[in-house]
Amino acid sequence: MSKTKILIFIDWYLPGYKAGGPIQSVANLVAHLKNDFDISIITRDTDYSETTPYSDVKSNKWIISDGIRIYYASKDQLSYSTMHKLIEEESFDYIYLNGIYSLYFTLIPLFILRKKHGKRIVIAARGMLSTGSLNVKKTKKQLFLRMIKMAK
């Protein structure tokens, strides 16, 4: 019997560390689930606030690292068409979106997936919906939340 497939979207992932807690949270989640689930991750090929790609990963292709598949997208590949191709090339049982204010790793995947009935999507808000957080860059966040509702 094949394993349940999970596709994770996260702006920054290992070997990155500058985005802090979210990277470690997802890395820990993956470490605990990878023996029971088939996990794939789509992320950037740079660390937070960096423009130089990681030197030890191959960009724009699926690689296997520690038993999971990872796609490190270069800046020029961050697009609707790339995300659409990656989502469509394989069937996933669950989609995990880490965060809510990311164009490429939340909003675009939601718009692509909105017509796929039966897809189970988990959005990890990670404190981004707290009153204090919502008051910082309020207009931008309200726009994102409206667009997420439209993607239903």
Language model feature labels by segment:
Residues 120, 130-152:
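Nucleotide-sugar donor phosphate/pyrophosphate-binding loop at the beta->alpha transition
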Residues 85-105, 109, 118-122:
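Short N-terminal targeting/anchoring amphipathic segment
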Residues 17-19, 70-75, 134-142:
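Short, flexible loop segments at the rims of nucleotide/cofactor-binding pockets, characterized by
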Residues 77-81, 107, 147-150:
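Structural motif corresponding to alpha-helix initiation and N-cap regions
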Residues 18, 51-52, 82, 105-108, ...:
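Short glycine-/acidic-enriched loop or helix-start segments at secondary-structure transitions
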Residues 1-56, 61-64, 90, 148-151:
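N-terminal subdomain of nucleotide-sugar transferases
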Residues 55, 70-84:
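Glycine-rich, highly charged phosphate/nucleotide-binding loops
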